[in-house]
Amino acid sequence: MKRTIRVGIVQQACTNDLKLNLEKLHRNIASVAQAGAQLVVLRELHNTPYFCQTEDTNLFDLAEPIPGPSTGFYSEIAAAYHIVLVTSLFERRAAGLYHNTAVVFDTDGSIAGKYRKMHIPDDPAYYEKFYFTPGDLGFEPIQTSIGKLGVQVCWDQWYPEGARIMALKGAELLIYPTAIGWESSDTQEEKMRQLGAWVTVQRGHAVANGLPVISVNRVGLEPDPSGQTNGIQFWGNSFVAGPQGELLAQASNLKEENLVVEIDMSRSENVRRWWPFLRDRRIEQFQDLAKRFID
């Protein structure tokens, strides 16, 4: 029997005005919900600009507990529109202990679960190790009223192991709130290589696991607060891929965009029958994957 889910993705730019950002997010969530979305996914750290371009201890003031003000705000929205909502927040767990945390709300506004980002980058303009402690909740799918969601965050999307563990634990969708873009000195050729790699690796997770993938990114130029660089041009291109990696929808790399995409969830069963990758895995030969490097 065919089973479909309508997914809303909100590709939005950000300003320094928190109130305006939240109002705009509310409008965009409402827009896709009213267009029939049952599941709505936001981008990484969507409340504010991407503050990790610089190291500033004052920016820890942006973090908040979970539950807290933002979870209250998004809980009301999820309940009002009867949607499952995937959000991405800067979590204050304790003094000096902070996480980059995805929080999932069910259709009644309750917190269905959360995921703390496991892989933390530390690259020019992406100084996340300064702000975030690596996650300690494991790769656990979050059970919701529409299914089990394998939610990870941004840099996690480059690692096949997380996607595979989510799939082995019964995830029905792989979801990645994201903040990624180009540095101003990159050539056009390099920009296209980076974007192509980003899309390809996630479509590969869809193929390898026989699951749909949802990836939602920021868009637009965000200046570097320190003035040391020209900032990040977030490349958008939020997309939904089916269980064979086929692109079902993809947003622009230049503009804000809301999309509502229908996913046929019954296809995963058939694809896994045709391509039984899970059946044929030689799990007794994979012990070396637990090593940092094999010298």
Residue locations for each model-derived region?
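Active-site-proximal beta-strand elements of phosphoester/diester hydrolases
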Residues: 4-14, 101, 114, 141, ...
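Residue-level detector of high-confidence beta-strand sites
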Residues: 101, 114, 250-252, 260
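CN hydrolase (nitrilase-like) catalytic-core segments centered on the catalytic cysteine
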Residues: 63-86, 148, 154-258
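Cys-nucleophile CN-hydrolase/nitrilase-fold catalytic domain and related Cys-dependent amidase chemistry
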Residues: 18, 27-107, 112-114, 180-211
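A short, polar/charged loop-to-alpha-helix boundary motif
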Residues: 117-131, 255-272
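Short beta-strand scaffold segments in enzyme catalytic cores
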Residues: 87-89, 101-104, 140, 238-240, ...
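Short, glycine-anchored, charge-dense loop/turn motifs used at functional sites
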Residues: 7, 104-112, 239-248
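Cysteine/selenocysteine-centered motifs that mediate thiol-based redox chemistry or coordinate metal-sulfur cofactors
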Residues: 139-169, 178, 268-295
